[in-house]
C-alpha cells in the first residue's frame, strides 16, 4: 500500500520519501513501482518519459530521519495499534512541528493514534483504497 501511495503522489508531481525498515524492503517497493509504471506504459496509459519523471520524484530510504523536513507523512504499516503508535511517536520526535501526520488505517481509531503524539491537531486519517496509483485524487 505504501508503495502505491508513494507512486500516486509522485505521479501527481510531488517529491516523495518512501521509507521502510530495511534497505531490501525499500528496493522491493521501488521495483514494484517500476513494474506498475511499466505496465502503464505497455497499456499506453503513460509515456516512457513520464515514468522517468515519476521515479525521479521518489527517494527510497531505510533511514526514518530522512522525513524530518516533510510537510505531510502518510503512514501505511499493517493494522496494529501498538506498531502504529510507536511509529507515530518516533515521527513526532523527528519531524518539524509544521509536519502533518496521516494514517492510512481503515479500521483503527484515528483519535487514539493522534493522542499518541504531541500534535493531535496536526494528525489526520487519510485512507487510500487499493490500488492507490489507480485511483483519482
Regions found by a protein language model. Name each.
Residues 17, 59, 74, 124-126:
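Hydrophobic/aromatic beta-strand patches that form the interior of the parallel beta-sheet core
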Residues 101-137:
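Rossmann-fold dinucleotide-binding core
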Residues 40-94:
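A structured beta-alpha segment of the ubiquitous adenosine-cofactor-binding alpha/beta core
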Residues 30, 84-85, 135:
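Conserved strand-to-helix beginnings and helix N-cap segments that scaffold or border functional pockets
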Residues 1, 33, 58, 73-76, ...:
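Buried hydrophobic positions in well-ordered alpha/beta secondary-structure cores of metabolic enzymes
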Residues 10-11, 67, 131-135:
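Short, flexible turn/loop "capping" segments at secondary-structure junctions
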Residues 2-16, 74-77, 84-91, 95, ...:
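Extended, hydrophobic alpha-helical segments in both membrane/secreted and soluble proteins
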Residues 1-39, 59, 94:
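NAD(P)+-binding Rossmann beta1-loop-alpha1 motif at the extreme N-terminus of oxidoreductases
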Amino acid at each position: 500500500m505504501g508503495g502505491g501511495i508513494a507512486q500516486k503522489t509522485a505521479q501527481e508531481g510531488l517529491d516523495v520519501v518512501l521509507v521502510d525498515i530495511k534497505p531490501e524492503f525499500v528496493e522491493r517497493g521501488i521495483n514494484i513501482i517500476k513494474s506498475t509504471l511499466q505496465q502503464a506504459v505497455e497499456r499506453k496509459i503513460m509515456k516512457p518519459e513520464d515514468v522517468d519523471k515519476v521515479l525521479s520524484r521518489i527517494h527510497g530510504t531505510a533511514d526514518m530521519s530522512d522525513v524530518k523536513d516533510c510537510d505531510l507523512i502518510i503512514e501505511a504499516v499493517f493494522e496494529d495499534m501498538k506498531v502504529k503508535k510507536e511509529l507515530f511517536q518516533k515521527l513526532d520526535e523527528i519531524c518539524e512541528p509544521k509536519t502533518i501526520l496521516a494514517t492510512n488505517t481503515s479500521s483503527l481509531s484515528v483519535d487514539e493514534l493522534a493522542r499518541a503524539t504531541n500534535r493531535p491537531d496536526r494528525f489526520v486519517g487519510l485512507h487510500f483504497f487499493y490500488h492507490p496509483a489507480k485511483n483519482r485524487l
